[in-house]
Amino acid sequence: YPMPLPGGIGMEGAGVVEEVGPDVTGFAPGDRVAYAAGPPGAYAQVHNMPARSVVALPEAVGFEAAAALMLKGMTVQYLFNRTVRLEPGQTILFHAAAGGVGLIAMQWARAMGVTVIGTAGSEEKAELARRHGCDHVILYRSEDIVERVREITQGAMVPVVYDSVGKDTFDASLAALAPFGTMVCFGASSGPVPPVPLTALRGTLYLTRPSLLAYAERREILESMAGGLFEMVGSGKVRPIIERRMPLAEAAQAHSDLEARRTTGATLLQP
C-alpha cells in the first residue's frame, strides 16, 4: 500500500477527543474514541481525524485493547460476516493463523462454531494458534498445504480460504478450495499475486480482494463493524493479544520485526 511521502503512517489508534471542528456533531472534547479507517497518521501524539472515520469507544473496551484490535478486529468482522457469511459447522482455511489478524480470527471462529485449519511457520506459532482456537495447524515450511487440507477434510476440501500472505500461498489456496468455494485474498505479506487467468478458477471458484477501507466508506457499515467487534470484546469471546509495547520512537524497529515475521499478535506503540 504505497503512500505519498513525506507523510504520517499508522492506521489504527485510540484516545480522547481534545477538540472538534465547528461542523462536527456527535463528538465532544473528552469523548473516548477509536479508529482504523481513515487518513494515516496514527504514529503521533496528536492526530487530526475526520469525524466520519472515528467511532465512540464503549467504557467496557480499554484504550490498549482498542488500539490493538480496531483494524485487525474489524477486518475479521467483515471477512466472517460480510465477504463470506460463515455458518456454524463449516471448516475454513486461514493462513498466518498466529499473526495479528489470525489470532483474532481464531477466537472469533471458535465463538461462531467454525472449524479452522490454520497455517503457521513454526511449532511455536502453531501452538499459539491452537491456544486461541485453531483446530488444525499446518506447518507450511515442512508440510504440503493442499495434501494436509485434503487429509483433514477427508477429501472434501474447504468452502472458504482466507489468505493474507499472497504470492507464496495463492496457488495452494486455490487448490484447497472445494467446488464453488471462495478465495478471499485480503493481503500480500509475501508479495503481490501475479495476474491470474480466469481458467485457474476451475469453472466454479470465486475470487475476491476485499479491503477494510472499501467496506468502511459508508458510515453505517463502519459503525456496524465496530459495534460487532466491541460486542465480541465486551462478551469476552475475543480479547487482544498484545505481544509487546514499544515507545513510538522505536517504530522503525517494530516495522523491521513485522517484516521479518518475528512477531505474533499485536505490537503497541505508545507516544
Regions found by a protein language model. Name each.
Residues 1-41:
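Glycine-rich beta-strand-centered segment in the early N-terminal region that forms part
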Residues 28, 59-62, 85-91, 155-156:
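Short helix-loop-beta connector
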Residues 37-51:
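A structural motif shared across PLP-dependent enzymes of the aminotransferase-like
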Residues 94, 110-169:
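Adenosine-nucleotide cofactor-binding segment
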Residues 101:
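Hydrophobic/small residue at the entry helix of a nucleotide-binding pocket
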Residues 112, 168-238, 271:
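Glycine-rich phosphate-binding loop and adjacent beta-alpha segment
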Residues 235-244, 252-271:
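C-terminal capping/lid region of NAD(P)-dependent oxidoreductase domains
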